[in-house]
């Protein structure tokens, strides 16, 4: 081999190895647009740059006043919650219309108040 070709290959290999970034095994500990790492729900919110709401429904509420499947998914899957709220917002559904819809779906008063607060927070977040 010629020396310039050998030198070129060596430099290419060294540069490619040095510039490769390892993602690591712990994806939840990765840095998201900041210097510090995150290990809580803030990571999902910052990564998506979206709305996140924590519901105050406990185990007894699930037993005595079970949520319909759609609202269970909205409570447990933040992306589903954002999608449904965006659909409501683009369909010009007001908060009162949303409450009427939840009443027709058979949600308990506590669940309605939780989802109403979440929808109001979403509308405020979206501006």
From Swiss-Prot:
It is found in: Secreted; Host cell. Residues 1-20 form the signal peptide. Induction: Expression is induced in presence of citrus root extracts or during the interaction with the susceptible host. A motif (RxLR-dEER) lies at residues 30-48. GO terms for cellular component: extracellular region; host cell. Keywords: Secreted, Signal, Virulence. It comes from the Eukaryota. The keyword Nucleus does not apply. Belongs to the RxLR effector family. The RxLR-dEER motif acts to carry the protein into the host cell cytoplasm through binding to cell surface phosphatidylinositol-3-phosphate. Secreted effector that partially suppresses elicitor-induced cell death in host and enhances virulence of P.parasitica. This is Secreted RxLR effector protein 3. The lineage of its organism: Eukaryota, Sar, Stramenopiles, Oomycota, Peronosporales.
């Amino acid at each position: 081999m010629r020396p310039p070709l050998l030198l070129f290959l060596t430099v290419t290999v060294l540069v490619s190895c040095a510039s490769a970034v390892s993602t690591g095994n712990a994806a939840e500990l990765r840095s998201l647009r900041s210097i510090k790492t995150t290990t809580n729900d803030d990571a999902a919110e910052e990564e998506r740059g979206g709305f996140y709401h924590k519901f105050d429904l406990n185990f007894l509420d699930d037993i005595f006043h079970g949520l319909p499947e759609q609202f269970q998914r909205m409570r447990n899957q933040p992306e589903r919650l954002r999608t449904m709220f965006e659909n409501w917002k683009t369909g010009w559904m007001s908060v009162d219309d949303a409450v009427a819809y939840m009443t027709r779906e058979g949600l308990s008063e506590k669940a309605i108040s939780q989802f109403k607060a979440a929808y109001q927070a979403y509308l405020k977040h979206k501006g």
